[in-house]
Amino acid sequence: MSNVIENLGKLDRKVTLAIPKAEVEKEKQERLVRLSKTVKMSGFRPGKVPMKMVEKQYGQQVEFEVRFDKAARKFFDITKEQDVKVAGQPKFEIKNEGVGEDEVAFDATFEVYPEVTIGDLSAAEVTRTSTEITDAEVDKTIDILRKQRVHYHARGESGEHGDGGADVTAQNGDRVTVDFVGKIDGVEFAGGKAEDFPFVLGEGRMLPEFEQATLGLKVGESKTFPLAFPADYHGKEVAGKTAEFTVTLKKVEWAHLPEVNEAFAKSLGIADGSVEKMRADIRENLEREVKRRTHAMLKDQVMEALLKASELDVPKALIEQDQERLVEMARRDLEQRGMPNAKDMPIPAEMFAQQAERRVKLGLILAEIVKANGLEAKADQIKAEIEDFAKSYEDPKEVMRWYYGDQQRLAEMEAYVLENNVVNFVCDKAKVTDKKVSFEELTAEGNAQQA
């Protein structure tokens, strides 16, 4: 039966589309006429190729295109008329059996969107984390910023950077410059030799045995020592083997951290060099980071709660579409990292199957909960979020214009606000436990979740 949608399973459907051959032939001829005005053939001027030759050359291809175009249009009309919500793209197959002589027919198989049932959210349990930024956290951040701006002085300098003389031994925190050579069974190996090689003792850049051997040396002194490469060492040719190294210390430099003063504040973008303004800006940035992390942690819990509380079948077509999106995202990421030929890199879509299913499932759940409870993002909510984000920039008005000047960026902020609305809605119904943690605990927990 044509035009009747058959139920093949939970989400699978099929409809037979019958199209009169006369309609196909009529549109085919119209397209061939249009094509004849531009087609080029040897021996004829453009637009002067006889219709018989145009039809002989292109007739079969044009008829094929017309058949599928008409099938697609008819499919759209039928599903729209019967209010069927199609998930993904239909698959068309030419139907040969049971077809009238004056028509062509296709079987279109497709999936529909599922019914989404969201259970009792009052049973959901989430933890809402909060963190207070203290003066100690501001001080720690300043220390990190100072270390990022560290510069080194050679041992033995006099004046304000005097350090007790050049005869001191290398200590943790010093930057040392060394020559070294390594041998395995008396033979040098690739990567085992260097001259004027600098590194900072205690940073862990070198293997522990190498750093330990360098500690305590004075300029000009050498030491020979055994070094066992770990079995999982990145250099496969030496992994699991023991080498004999000789290291010679050529220079020792001590770390000089900048003072926290007007010049330091100006280096961080504080125009008037106010240390108090610098501290206030650092506190504000830390509070913004706290808001971002705590919101992300809460959102993840809410999404998991929604997944557990909801029942639905997920259309395979939507999963496959999302897998392809994730593949393209992976290729773009590799391209941005400088990977050669990233655009053509073969990335199997199957590796994203679970991630895609989860994303699609959450998307369907969110759409249902937003629609059922009127949680759409309002214009004033979007504006408020953009204004809050813009505060961290020197020219907030320019940031506002940047957002409102691009529909894609605006859509991303709308999605963020919509997610916030869902998170707040679920938290109002769920069992929420408030938990205070230090900034250090917050960052450690957030990093653990990302890992």
Swiss-Prot record:
The record's EC number reads 5.2.1.8
Where along the sequence do coiled-coil regions lie?
none
> Where does the protein end up?
Cytoplasm
Keyword Isomerase attributed? yes
- Does this entry carry the keyword Cytoplasm? yes
Keywords from UniProt, A to Z, are: Cell cycle, Cell division, Chaperone, Cytoplasm, Isomerase, Rotamase
PROSITE patterns found in the cross-reference section: FKBP_PPIASE
- Gene Ontology BP annotations: 'de novo' cotranslational protein folding; cell division; chaperone-mediated protein folding; protein transport; protein unfolding
A GO molecular function term, named singly, is: protein folding chaperone
InterPro entries reported for this sequence: PPIase_dom_sf, PPIase_FKBP_dom, Trig_fac, Trigger_fac_C, Trigger_fac_C_sf, Trigger_fac_ribosome-bd_bac, Trigger_fac_ribosome-bd_sf, Trigger_fact/SurA_dom_sf
The record's listing under Pfam families reads:
FKBP_C, Trigger_C, Trigger_N
One Gene Ontology cellular component: cytoplasm
Location of the PPIase FKBP-type domain: 173-258
Q: Which chemical reaction does it catalyze?
A: [protein]-peptidylproline (omega=180) = [protein]-peptidylproline (omega=0)
EC supergroup of this enzyme:
isomerase
Domain commentary: Consists of 3 domains; the N-terminus binds the ribosome, the middle domain has PPIase activity, while the C-terminus has intrinsic chaperone activity on its own.
User: What function is annotated for this protein?
Assistant: Involved in protein export. Acts as a chaperone by maintaining the newly synthesized protein in an open conformation. Functions as a peptidyl-prolyl cis-trans isomerase.
Entry similarity comment: Belongs to the FKBP-type PPIase family. Tig subfamily.
Q: What is this protein called?
A: Trigger factor
- Which species is the source of this protein? Cupriavidus taiwanensis (strain DSM 17343 / BCRC 17206 / CCUG 44338 / CIP 107171 / LMG 19424 / R1) (Ralstonia taiwanensis (strain LMG 19424))
